[in-house]
């Protein structure tokens, strides 16, 4: 019984030591002389050891190549924020997958709390640049209804997804009217 009590107290102490930390990043991506529109960007917190990496936020660049991401997590130690870009700029059509660029973000922009109080402006990046330690992403999780990556929207099929959802809502309305 005493061992269980000690374990419970230790777990409560560990939980209390966890602190909310957050970060935000914004910028603009180019592909040559023009904006890199609909480029997938993600904000990660990378962990070492058995603790899995945490996806803090994700999205796509707008028509001007601009993005803004922010997110946070509870960690015992300071977070290691990383910004990732997945793109096909200046890429051979024969190569599979997308180019993956990973940039570490300055720890000075980490703030306490669930909402970031400071935003790191990464500036303008031209994706024609070959970055050090650049990788390729060969597998991409696609949208599954209500499952993992349910918020994933493929920009190439966004019009199809929107028309499908409007058709589904029209079918539901027709069903309601029938009964």
UniProtKB/Swiss-Prot annotation:
GO cellular component: cell surface; extracellular region
Stretches the record annotates as Disordered: 144-179
InterPro entries, sorted: Transthyretin-like, Transthyretin-like_sf
Top-rank taxon: Eukaryota
Biased composition (Basic and acidic residues): 157-179
Lipid biosynthesis as UniProt keyword: no
Keywords on record: Secreted, Signal
PANTHER family noted in UniProt: TRANSTHYRETIN-LIKE FAMILY PROTEIN-RELATED, TRANSTHYRETIN-LIKE PROTEIN 46
Name listed for the protein in its UniProt record: Transthyretin-like protein 46
Protein's organism: Caenorhabditis elegans
